[in-house]
């Protein structure tokens, strides 16, 4: 249940205020559907077991007037769990209200020490201590509500019910009813039920919020790198319908702890379905913000030197033996240098045909001369527009170049006699080698970054990346994220 409730909120992050209302302003939207909750609910038992085991069971003391014995004082001390198992659980979404989880046949054996005392008719004080076991069978009903608290998800289970089908007291391992057992069972059972309900429900609520913080902290880490982070705080309370959970996030990129507080676009719930397990909706504004921080952080540049430059040319099938190549590089291709960098922040837009990137770049070629004392530099300034479609398969990101346009702006260091041929040659190099190489490196960089954050540990099934005018949609199915649950349970110990 807790896994089904909180692991779904893996985008939730930093602390900011939540707005109220029915409009959904967001840069990023996460929707998790009923089929996903059923998958996550598979491991409910492990989290519930942690709640039972972590709960603090206080000593139970009391006094009871009993026939023949008079006033009997008693106490159950050092109550602990010696055995616990869970038969099954079910999860349901209640429209605009809660996530309801029913847990059936929780078999729990408690153990501890029973101390009791009384005064006989002859004035003799009797004090006894005996070990006990309590064999119980319990059903739980937990209705969890999700709210936004200062930009973070909070969970609350105001409705938490325990139904006891069995509550048997065994003293010192004896299974046959004894007179002490008969005397104590009835009036201890009622008190014990109240204590167990209070402590277990309290611990379930505590663990659910610990898990919420755990997942949100992990999400913030996944979506950060160096000085770049993402403000994924909630813009309002999560939405619960009969078929999905949905959360809305700001999606501002943060650079060196500074982010722009721009107006957020309005999200329409009709843009997402409920046939896949998990949906992410990214507004075009998110990619604009990404381009800005990447440019500010100096990440939009590439430098190739010597043998690496020659190897790249050969990788893309560029003929390095042609005469003009030898002429341009001065006979020393292993000493050539090429640098590429953006002159200003790229513009990124989402369209039906793909993600369109408009960038102004400078490409500089530096080739040594035969005396190796001098070099010749050729510099190109160009506007490049590329249309890209992304896909994810076998734990790798793939970028497909659908279309590109290059508009030359300025060219320097070309003599009149060589300008046309050299410019054509270098332009061909940019087209046939430069753009594919940049795409290939972006694939590798993004894949390595995602894997370093643990994305490769997730069992992502049939992911689809779909672009539409103004937004990008990511939809997928998945297997249970066992590694996240293991990490969380270890953090509790």
From Swiss-Prot:
Induction: Up-regulated by high-fat, high-cholesterol diet. It holds the Pfam family LBP_BPI_CETP. PROSITE patterns: LBP_BPI_CETP. Glycans are attached at residues 59, 105, 257, 358, 413. GO terms for cellular component: extracellular space; high-density lipoprotein particle. It catalyses: cholesteryl (9Z-octadecenoate)(in) = cholesteryl (9Z-octadecenoate)(out); 1,2,3-tri-(9Z-octadecenoyl)-glycerol(in) = 1,2,3-tri-(9Z-octadecenoyl)-glycerol(out); cholesteryl (9Z,12Z)-octadecadienoate(in) = cholesteryl (9Z,12Z)-octadecadienoate(out). It is found in: Secreted. Residues 1-17 form the signal peptide. Probably primarily expressed in liver and adipose tissues. Detected in adrenal gland, mesenteric fat, spleen and aorta. SMART domains: BPI1, BPI2. One of its GO terms (molecular function) is phospholipid transporter activity. Disulfide bonds join 160-201. Keywords: Cholesterol metabolism, Disulfide bond, Glycoprotein, Lipid metabolism, Lipid transport, Secreted, Signal, Steroid metabolism, Sterol metabolism, Transport. GO terms for biological process: cholesterol homeostasis; cholesterol metabolic process; cholesterol transport; high-density lipoprotein particle remodeling; low-density lipoprotein particle remodeling; phosphatidylcholine metabolic process; phospholipid homeostasis; reverse cholesterol transport. It comes from the Eukaryota. Involved in the transfer of neutral lipids, including cholesteryl ester and triglyceride, among lipoprotein particles. Allows the net movement of cholesteryl ester from high density lipoproteins/HDL to triglyceride-rich very low density lipoproteins/VLDL, and the equimolar transport of triglyceride from VLDL to HDL. Regulates the reverse cholesterol transport, by which excess cholesterol is removed from peripheral tissues and returned to the liver for elimination. Belongs to the BPI/LBP/Plunc superfamily. BPI/LBP family. This is Cholesteryl ester transfer protein. It comes from Macaca fascicularis (Crab-eating macaque). The lineage of its organism: Eukaryota, Metazoa, Chordata, Craniata, Vertebrata.
């Amino acid at each position: 249940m807790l896994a089904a409730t909180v692991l779904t909120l893996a985008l939730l992050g930093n602390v900011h205020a939540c707005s109220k209302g029915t409009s959904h302003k967001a840069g990023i939207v996460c929707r998790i559907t009923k089929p996903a909750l059923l998958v996550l609910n598979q491991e409910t038992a492990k989290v519930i077991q942690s709640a039972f085991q972590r709960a603090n069971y206080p000593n139970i003391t009391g006094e009871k007037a009993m026939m023949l014995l008079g006033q009997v004082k008693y106490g159950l001390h050092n109550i602990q769990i010696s055995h616990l198992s869970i038969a099954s659980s079910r999860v349901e979404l209640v429209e605009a209200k809660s996530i309801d989880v029913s847990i059936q046949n929780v078999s729990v054996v408690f153990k501890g020490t029973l101390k009791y005392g009384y005064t006989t008719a002859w004035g003799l004080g009797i004090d006894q201590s005996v070990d006990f076991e309590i064999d119980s069978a319990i059903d739980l009903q937990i209705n969890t509500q999700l709210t936004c608290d200062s930009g973070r998800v909070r969970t609350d289970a105001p409705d938490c019910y325990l139904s006891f089908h069995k509550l048997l007291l065994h003293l010192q391992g004896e299974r046959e009813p004894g007179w002490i057992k008969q005397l104590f069972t009835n009036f201890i059972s009622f008190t014990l039920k109240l204590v167990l309900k209070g402590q277990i429900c309290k611990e379930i609520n505590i663990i659910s919020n610990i898990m919420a913080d755990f997942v949100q902290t992990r999400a913030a880490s996944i979506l950060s790198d160096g000085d770049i982070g993402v403000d994924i705080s909630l813009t309002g309370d999560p939405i619960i319908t009969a078929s999905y959970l949905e959360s809305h996030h700001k999606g501002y990129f943060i650079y060196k702890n500074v982010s722009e507080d721009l107006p957020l676009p309005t999200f329409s719930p009709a843009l997402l379905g409920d046939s896949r397990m998990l949906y992410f909706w990214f507004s075009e504004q998110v990619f604009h913000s990404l381009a800005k921080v990447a440019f500010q952080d100096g990440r939009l540049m590439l430098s190739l030197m010597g043998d690496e430059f020659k190897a790249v040319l050969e990788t893309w099938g560029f003929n390095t033996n042609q005469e003009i190549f030898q002429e341009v590089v001065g006979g020393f291709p292993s000493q050539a240098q090429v640098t590429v960098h953006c002159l200003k922040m790229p513009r990124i837009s989402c369209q039906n045909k793909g993600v369109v990137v408009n960038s102004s770049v400078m490409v500089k070629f530096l080739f040594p001369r035969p005396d190796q004392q001098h070099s010749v530099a050729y510099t190109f300034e160009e506007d490049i527009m590329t249309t890209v479609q992304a896909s994810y398969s076998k734990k790798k990101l793939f970028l497909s170049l659908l279309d590109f346009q290059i508009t030359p702006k300025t060219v320097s260091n070309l003599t009149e006699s060589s300008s046309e041929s050299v410019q054509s040659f270098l332009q061909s190099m940019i087209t046939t080698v430069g753009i594919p190489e940049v795409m290939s490196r972006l694939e590798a960089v993004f894949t390595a970054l995602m894997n370093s954050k643990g994305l490769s540990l997730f069992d992502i099934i049939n992911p689809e990346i779909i672009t539409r005018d103004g937004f990008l949609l990511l939809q997928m199915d998945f297997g249970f994220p066992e590694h996240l649950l293991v990490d969380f349970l270890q953090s509790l110990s």
